[in-house]
Regions:
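C-terminal and inter-domain tail/linker signature
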Residues: 1-133
């Protein structure tokens, strides 16, 4: 059964809400399928665990991280959602060979997620964190 537009939008908004501190790890587990594949792993593994490790690093480096959904495009036929998001957090640890700076750092990104049976099975994404430098 295909997910409704409202269900896909709600799943996506919950997913982006994970990129805030503190992370709701139970929600992370519920949202990501066990066979989740990160198609844009940025040098880490493509698994659910590797994605969780990347998120844990992000919120450790930016412990006051807050994220916002700026735009959503939903395709009910494929179960895919494109989301444009933004976040800001204070850099408290070394990240991408910079810092800690103690400065608020804006981060923006565009993600595409694929949802099957209410869980995210695949993710593609690109982030801009150039303001961090």
């Amino acid at each position: 059964m295909k997910a409704s537009r409202a269900d896909l939008e709600a799943t996506t908004r919950q997913w982006i809400s994970l990129w805030c501190t503190p992370v709701d790890w139970a929600l992370f587990d519920r949202l990501h399928a066990d066979d989740f594949e990160d198609c844009s792993p940025a040098g880490r593994g493509a698994t659910k665990k590797a994605f969780a490790d990347g998120l844990a690093e992000l919120v450790r480096v930016f412990p006051d991280l807050r994220s916002t959904v700026d735009d959503l495009v939903v395709d009910e036929t494929t179960g895919r959602v494109a989301v444009r998001w933004s976040a800001v957090g204070t850099n408290r640890e070394r990240f991408l060979r910079v810092g800690p700076t103690g400065k608020k750092t804006p981060i923006t990104g565009i993600e595409i997620i694929e949802v099957r049976d209410g869980r995210i099975v695949r993710r593609w994404g690109e982030w801009d964190i150039t303001a961090h430098r």
